[in-house]
């Protein structure tokens, strides 16, 4: 789970800098423990499948491999393709993901952060104007460029070609971009939807 979900607390900023730094800190902690061999792997599906991409953006020496299963290479890329938005684009990101940190208990206030307020506005603005209207909200949540520039580990990319949620463009041509950048990459692609193979 990510910050603000499960039994964790703190601000869940919906794949923003705080979450990315938290994931990187977890990799460093795991890689530096006495019982660790110093090599960390990350796996996850859907939102949790995006956290391995986040970790890989830092080039952390302890991150040996990532296994994103239907994970996002970027948040805006989930709902916009070739300049066109899906119908869910203006509300999906914060309407669905934003609800993860809110469960009606006394910790809700501590789990909220400024990006909860900024997010819905950026979703609507991007839907209206086709991109980043102000600030760096979407750029901060795009991972692939930093992975290609910084990551030194390997990638095992898993994606269903019938995935209606995280579309296959998050895997193809991404696997080719990874290989072109010299990142050891393998893929498992098949005829399933937003699920495990």
Specify the residue positions occupied by each region the protein language model found.
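Short beta-strand immediately N-terminal to the catalytic nucleophile in serine-hydrolase-like folds
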Residues: 42-44, 69, 158
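Conserved alpha/beta-hydrolase "acid-adjacent" motif
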Residues: 164-172
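Accessory cap/linker subdomain of secreted extracellular hydrolases
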Residues: 54-150
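Glycine-rich nucleophile elbow surrounding the catalytic serine of serine-hydrolase chemistry
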Residues: 44-54, 165
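Catalytic histidine neighborhood in serine/cysteine hydrolases
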Residues: 178-196
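Cap/lid segment of the alpha/beta-hydrolase catalytic domain
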Residues: 1-31
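Alpha/beta-hydrolase fold nucleophile elbow
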Residues: 34-47
């Amino acid at each position: 789970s990510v910050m603000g979900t499960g039994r964790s607390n703190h601000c869940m900023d919906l794949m923003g800098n705080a979450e990315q730094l938290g994931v990187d800190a977890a990799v460093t902690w795991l890689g530096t423990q006495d019982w660790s061999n110093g090599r960390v792997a990350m796996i996850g599906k859907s939102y949790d499948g995006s956290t391995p991409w986040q970790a890989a953006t830092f080039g952390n020496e302890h991150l040996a491999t990532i296994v994103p299963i239907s994970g996002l290479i970027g948040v805006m890329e989930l709902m916009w393709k070739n300049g066109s938005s899906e119908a869910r684009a203006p509300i999906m990101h914060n309407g669905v993901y934003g609800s993860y940190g809110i469960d009606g208990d006394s910790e809700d206030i501590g789990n909220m952060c400024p990006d909860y307020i900024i997010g819905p506005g950026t979703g609507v603005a991007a839907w209206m104007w086709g991109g980043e209207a102000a600030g760096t909200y979407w750029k901060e949540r795009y991972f692939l460029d930093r992975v290609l520039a910084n990551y030194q580990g390997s990638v095992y990319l898993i994606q269903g070609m019938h995935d209606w949620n995280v579309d296959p463009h998050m895997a193809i041509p991404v696997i080719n971009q990874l290989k072109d950048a010299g990142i050891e990459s393998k893929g498992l692609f098949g005829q399933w939807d937003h699920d495990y193979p």
